């Protein structure tokens, strides 16, 4: 065998041997391919689970569902607001210029007569049948207590069309002064508010009045202390 033949046989044998895949570049390439495959499989699995369990879905369906929920709510709010504007309501205050009597007035600031309620003969006239909140407050005061007890009353009455006699709906009595010596009375100025309120079934053209027994003790130092009103429910 010649030398050239031996060299050729060695080269052919080297070519026949499998080449190693090792080396820095080969290892990095295999690692990148494995990581990419893992991320791809994990992402596909996560997307499938989200779609399967309904966590995500078409935005169009979500938008339509939201609109279906909001539309009845908006309609209800609009209807409630419109109904509130149409209900009878009244709020009147006492006239401080009316000496010795409790005279209700509708011409001062923060007073209101709406949707059929009238103020006639110092009474509120109900325009329609229904449930009404009736309320009133008075404030009494004095510089000193007299030697005899003072009894203050506040009453809301109803004169109904179905029967002729006036009936008390709400009433309260208070006694801020229990009597005493003149020296004790001089040092004891007093204030006594009385608030009345309740819900009643009223009829059209019923007349409501709020009255007291001692108007001389009414306190008009601040506005909004003595008032009377109704609100349809």
UniProtKB/Swiss-Prot annotation:
UniProt modification remark: The soluble form derives from the membrane form by proteolytic processing. The membrane-bound form is further proteolytically processed by SPPL2A or SPPL2B through regulated intramembrane proteolysis producing TNF intracellular domains (ICD1 and ICD2) released in the cytosol and TNF C-domain 1 and C-domain 2 secreted into the extracellular space.
Extracellular side, ranges: 58-233
Keyword Cell wall biogenesis/degradation in annotation: no
Any single Gene Ontology cellular-component annotation: cell surface
Membrane topology: Single-pass type II membrane protein
Source domain of life: Eukaryota
Modified residue annotations for Phosphoserine: 2
Family matches, as InterPro entries: TNF, TNF_alpha, TNF_CS, TNF_dom, Tumour_necrosis_fac-like_dom
Family: Belongs to the tumor necrosis factor family.
Subunit field text: Homotrimer. Interacts with SPPL2B.
Name of the protein: Tumor necrosis factor
Organism field: Lama glama (Llama)
């Amino acid at each position: 065998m010649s030398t050239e033949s031996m060299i050729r046989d060695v080269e052919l044998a080297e070519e026949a041997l499998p080449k190693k895949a090792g080396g820095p570049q080969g290892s990095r390439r295999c690692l990148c391919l494995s990581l990419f495959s893992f991320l791809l499989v994990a992402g596909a699995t996560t997307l499938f689970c989200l779609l399967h369990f309904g966590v995500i879905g078409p935005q169009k369906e979500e938008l339509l569902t939201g609109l279906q929920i909001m539309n009845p709510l908006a309609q209800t709010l609009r209807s409630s607001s419109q109904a509130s504007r149409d209900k009878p309501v009244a709020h009147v205050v006492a006239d401080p210029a009316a000496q010795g009597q409790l005279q209700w007035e509708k011409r001062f600031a923060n007073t209101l007569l709406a949707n059929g309620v009238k103020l006639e003969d110092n009474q509120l006239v109900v325009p329609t049948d229904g449930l009404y909140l009736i309320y009133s407050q008075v404030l009494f005061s004095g510089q000193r207590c007299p030697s005899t007890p003072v009894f203050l009353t506040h009453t809301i009455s109803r004169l109904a069309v179905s029967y002729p006699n006036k009936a008390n709906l709400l009433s309260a009595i208070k006694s801020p002064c229990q009597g005493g010596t003149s020296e004790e009375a001089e040092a004891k100025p007093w204030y006594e508010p009385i608030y009345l309120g309740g819900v009643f079934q009223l009829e059209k053209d019923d007349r409501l009045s709020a009255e007291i027994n001692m108007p001389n003790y009414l306190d008009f130092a601040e506005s909004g202390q003595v008032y009377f009103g109704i609100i349809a429910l």
